[in-house]
Amino acid sequence: MRYAFYSHGGCENHGCEAIVRTLSAMIKNTHPESTIKLYTLDAQSDKSGDLPNIDESEEFNYTLPVSNTTAVQKIKISFLSRKSQKAADEYFYSLSCKNPSLKENDVYISVGGDNYCYGDGHMAAAFNRELKKLGKKTVLWGCSIGEEDLSEDKIKDLKTFDLIVARESLTYDALKKSEANKNLVLFPDPAFTLDIDKKVSESFNVKPNTLGFNISSLVGEYSAKGTSIEDISTEFLRYILDSSDKNILLIPHVTKPLDGDQLILGRIAERLGSSRVSVVPSTFTASQYKSVISRCDMFIGARTHATIAAYSTCVPTLVIGYSVKSRGIAKDIFGTDEGLVIPVSEIDCTEKPIKDYEKFLSKKEVYRKHLEKFMPDYIEKARNSINELFEI
């Protein structure tokens, strides 16, 4: 069987790397004769990753509009726009989805879990339609979609997938309620199964009593109006330094040169100016970041797959949440997201994160014990999710 992954944003997004690495390993462990092709949006970025089970890779960024349209195509776009802007957009996006090599593979797996969570989803839908025209089976793996994101157009497109794997119950319940797809299942994100690169344990020391911290400039887009997530994060961490003897390790998890986490974290470290604050290099792989996170005493983070690295290694984790996925994952692990997720929309000063941090700190060891008991079966469930793929 020839499988193909698409909507992979590149390995400088180490959540994307973790999904591709684990999902490809799960396929190969069960069916080693299978071939897996990766359609990547950023081949240059993939050079920083570690994807041993990918047989072939091709850069194909269907999210970029075609640079040139023919006269006939322009006329068609103009005609469609008079009838419906949606129809015109769908046709325009479909022009970017043409690729002769798409005929070569049997099953296409969308590994971009957030594709239907933000915006109108027209680009993702256009690519799915193109694959369906070619008679291909399509799978939406590890998705998160809020009920508020489910437009009539999205539901129509979601119905055409041969399998949808929701990664948390809030998404599963929303899709079930909307009857978005009869082939809908619920399994943990495959990144919960990511292995740890033990070599980095020897080369990168994590001090005792270390708090791991991750934030990104992306979070600022969802924060309370008029607030600076960088300023609030800096003062919040200054409070921790002043009120405890904790060391603070700033851990990037998306390391793109222009807008990676390392930029905002580097500025925060410089502003704090403390010998107890350090920044993890932006050159690590997903497995290496997981190794670092696993040795922290606790973790506070915004990037979903950084928090998954912490959860899966039984590190007590307080999430800075900005979408349904953070609430859903916490709920599935602990039975509730209360006290475990700080909604970024409610952060307008340091008072909220400090208050939630202190509450979390008082229950930290309770959370650790729960993770130690809960995680083995949860990770095994994530591994077993691959059997759903072989049933379609």
Model segments located where?
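Active-site anion-handling motifs in enzyme catalytic cores
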Residues: 1-392
